[in-house]
Structures are given as structure tokens and as C-alpha cells.
């Protein structure tokens, strides 16, 4: 038995500490001739087969009983393609030797990844099906620059880290290994010996599929095909188009009635898409679906950033859901969470023994509110990981927009921190300059590669220029959630109407900054959780008043400048607070159980969406001051508001809201134009379970001066109601 490799080297393989397997294993030219070395723990015999002649060339010698084989190939003077016939006791199988293949990452990809400027890093890193030298398999790559050894482990090698150590590329910090015959759906992880000599088992940060919790392995899955953006979908995102967003948590919109289990992506699509279409929403916004370990995070603490959650099926199933939405003319927005990640040991935390993805200093890298870690946006590879992820979801699944979660927590270093708990930037300021640059870069990439995709910011401060283009010094988002409008108006609606006169400005203040950004008016999931109650329970008064208040509020919201967002269940005034573990209370739409109140609100929201889409005055000039004018802004005594909305072509709608339970008959409002004003929507209609007061179809302008206008109209403003009056041309 001739040992051609030093025993210390062999021992290092079986100890799992050898960091350069390709320097030893596979086929090598030596002064003795062509030599083949194989590491196959627990194998008994290994015969080398010439792939061209299919003949046995040499039987390798077992030089270490733990499973290390080598031999000089007789009469061979050049490398050749081979496979191995391996005997495990009496059984044998034909195997490819992963260590006979050359490096597969090309120099350009390696350089771009090292620089952190690869536009689509997910096309290189992770697990990819490839064919090399007529051999099909999966190429695994992972970034772990400070690891001392990395192996691929999975159900194809008994999760044994000794069997498949990877090749290291020092210039980029990437480890690589091509494994023949690995199949779709097989489970895998990366086993690392980290910088501190600790053994770590990590899921693939770039995995396209992952196991459902509590299991944590990545799953081999094909890179989804590119979905081309269409002009119709692109146009639907523009600021001069009607955008009415239905926000959905897939795990609780509907559930299986028999066992309370989740529906899968296809079952959800079959029910959700027709419903959204029928209700008249233009967009669906999905709470995060990147794989996440904790159900109670609702997806806002993701670990598998490239993997659609397996709670509801496969990546293909998710893609079909989006396709069905597009077939029905509905755009899809995804909640995206690039701000932080959980500290689960199988995830990104201390990935290679160092703070690789997160800031090292807890004053920068630990989020005490959520017990999560904050991405190190100053590290080019991390920025590349996240920006690439944004492009991946939009390009590979056909999403029409991304809503970026918790932007304020990203751009401020002192977010939710006291003095002494945060680290200033290089200029001594509180802004996270790296995060700001990351957001600008990501929005620039999306805008350049996929023009028309909507980028929406949930940004809760007055940070300037959120929706300005990056080239003009802005963050580059297309829309920003108007959290100020939401907070102010909900505070107003909670008040007894008697006290609303003292808080009149809460309903009007948003107009002072309306044109500083492009806004979305959000009534989101955040307002119906954590003890806040449902929207209907926030309204003041008895049952009649609560529902009338909500209807009036919706009417006001749909006419106010800004795109609309409504969380699921709010469209029918769900009575209880949202519970992510249960279906919405759809039974309330049965008038026998809901008293007709809930179905009335649902009919109103449907009609609001229809009216909104059909009346250009309500959306075309959302971002232009010419599209809005207060007609009555100071009548705090009666808690009445009136304003005019106008389109590019001069179409006019007068909106009047009364937020007291007292009808305002013959209420005079000055208008800009004479003519007949048709009542096109009244939230007090009996159709919506209102008291059915109104204006008999229309009102006519008279030459009676009011509020500085030569013309005026006399309106019956129902109690706790909003009325839309359209000027007949």
C-alpha cells in the first residue's frame, strides 16, 4: 500500500479542517505520472472508469481505512474524463468525482462579486443547475471570506462535512463546488469552520427555496425564469393613475375551514384574485413572503431573503399567483425587508465567525426593539446582496413594486436609541449615510433595469426627498406612506363628535405638506394589531355612529389627494383585531350575523374604488396643487369640510364631509363653476346601511356669493357622511 499523500494531510480531511481540497483531491500530474486521489468515507473499493472507453483504468489503493484512496494511472500521460465505481460492502454505484472539475466561476463574476457591484449576484451565488463536461449537477457557491473550511452538506452526502469540502477563491471570499447528480428538491446547508475554529451549520443566504420552520435547511430549486414587464402594468403604477391597494397577509386572509390550516398559493389565487377584482382594487400588496422562522413576525423578520415561504407551497406556486393577478389586470406589490434580520443560528448572524452581514458594534448592528441584527450597508457585498434581492423579486417573479419596510430605522443611527446608545456617522450626524446610499442605489438599479416598477417607502419621519430621484439628491422612491395623515385622521375619528371642533386641523394638516412627496394614504395592518383594535372599534359612538363614521372617513380618504391602501378586513369593517393565526371574520358579511352593517361597508368600498377609477379628477393630479382646492376648511363649529378635486382636462368633483351626527341641510358652499352638480356617491345611502339623506340626485349652482366665490351650491350634508358631487359638463 503506497501512500502518495502525507498522513497529516489525510488526517486534516477526516478532521474536517483541510481548506484546499482541490490541491489534493482529483487528478494531478506528479513526477510519478498522472495520479488520482479520492476521499470517500466508509467506501471499501474504488475503480476508475474511463468515460470515453467505459473501461476500468485502475483500482485505487485504500491508503487510509477511513476512506482515502489514491493510485498512479498506468500509461496515462494526460488528463482524461473519468468516473468512479465505488463499492460499499457488496453494493456498488457509479459516481462522478466533484474534484475532477475545474473552477466554474468566471473571472468577471468573481471580480464583480469581490467589488460588490454585481447587478445580479443571485445568478452566481447559491445553488444553480448546470451541465459541465456533459455532466449535470448543481454548482454551490457561498460568500464566507473568513471561514477556514466550508463544505456542502445535505441528504445527498449524509450531512457529512468531510465528504464535500469546497474550493476557496481568496480574491472574492467565495467558496465553490460542483456536485454532479444533485437533484431538484434536495436539502442542503453549508458547514463552516469559522474564524474562531467553531463548527457552524448555515442555510444558504441565496437559496431559492427553504424548509418550513422548525426545519431550517435550504432546498435545491431552479432560478425562476425572467418575467417581462408590460406597458400596461408599468402604466398602472404611474402617479396620474388610480392606485387602490389591498394589503394582504396570505396566512390569514382565508384559511381551511375544517382544520384552520393555510391555503396554498394556488388556492389563495383562486379565491383572492377574483375577490380583489370584484372589489375594484387595482393593486395587491403582500406582507413579506421571504422565508422566515417565526410566524408571529408576519414575515417582517426574514432569513431566506431569496426564497418564497414554503408555508403556502413552492416558488412556482407563488409565481402562478402573481400571473393570475396580472391576467385579471391587478398589479402586485411585495413588502420587502432590507432593514434587519433575526439572529437565528442557521441564518446570517456571525456567518463565518465574524460580523459578516451585520455591523460589528451592537450600537450600530443590534435593533433592541425587535431583537434583530442590522445589515452593514457600508459593506459592498452586503449592499450587493440586498440590491440584488430587490431586482430578483421584480425580475424573476414579475412583481410590480416593492414597499420597503421601516425606512426610518435604516436611515437614522439613533432610531429608537437613547443618548450613548448609538454611533454618529463620520460627520458626527445621526443619519446612516451607508443606508441612504444603499436605498438610492437600489432604487436607481430598479429604475434603470425595470422602468415603471414602483418603489414605496414606509418612512415615518419628515426626512426630505424620499420620493425625489437620486440624481436630484433624493432617495429615489416613487411613493411614501403618509403616516402623518393616517395618525392625525385616526386620532380625529376616535373623538366624540362634540370634541372634534377643537381638533379640526387634524383633518386638514396633511395638505400643508401634501406636495412635498408623492403619498400613499395607508390604513395598514399596523393599525389593527397590538391592542389597537380594529378600525371600526376606533370609531366613536354607538353601532350606527361607528359604521357611519367609518363610511364617512373612507369617503373622505378616497377623495383626498394620495393613492389608497387598505388592509384586508377593513373593507368590510372587521369587528375584532387582526389575528395572524386565524381567517378574517367573513361570516360578518352574512346579514343574519352582521346585521347588514358589514356588507354595507363592503359595498361602499367597492363603489368607492369604482368611482375612484372612473373619475379622473380623483387621481390625475394627486401630486399637483392644481388638482385640489379647499372650499370649506374653517367650519370647525359644524365639523364640515369641503374641497374640489380637478382633473387635467378640467373635470370637477366637489367633496363634502360632515363629521357630526347632525344633518346639515341647505349647507351653502362656494364653487368655481356654474352648472349642475350630480351626486355620484353618498356614504349615507341606505344601500350602505345609512339613513338615506341626500340631494335627490343633483344640486344646481346659484349666483349667490359664498367663501369668496361668485357661485355657490346648497347641499344637504347627511350626518356622519361624505358626499361626492360631480360637475356635469
From Swiss-Prot:
Keyword Glycosyltransferase recorded: yes
GO terms for biological process, alphabetical: glycogen biosynthetic process
GO cellular component terms, A-Z: cytosol
This protein's UniProt keywords: Carbohydrate metabolism, Glycogen biosynthesis, Glycogen metabolism, Glycosyltransferase, Transferase
InterPro entries, sorted: A-amylase/branching_C, Branching_enzy, GlgB, GlgB_N, GlgB_N_E_set_prok, Glyco_hydro_13_cat_dom, Glyco_hydro_13_N, Glyco_hydro_b
Name the record gives this protein: 1,4-alpha-glucan branching enzyme GlgB
EC numbers on record: 2.4.1.18
Catalytic activity entry: Transfers a segment of a (1->4)-alpha-D-glucan chain to a primary hydroxy group in a similar glucan chain
Main function: Catalyzes the formation of the alpha-1,6-glucosidic linkages in glycogen by scission of a 1,4-alpha-linked oligosaccharide from growing alpha-1,4-glucan chains and the subsequent attachment of the oligosaccharide to the alpha-1,6 position.
Species for this entry: Mannheimia succiniciproducens (strain KCTC 0769BP / MBEL55E)
SMART domains recorded: Aamy (SM00642)
Pathway membership, UniProt: Glycan biosynthesis; glycogen biosynthesis
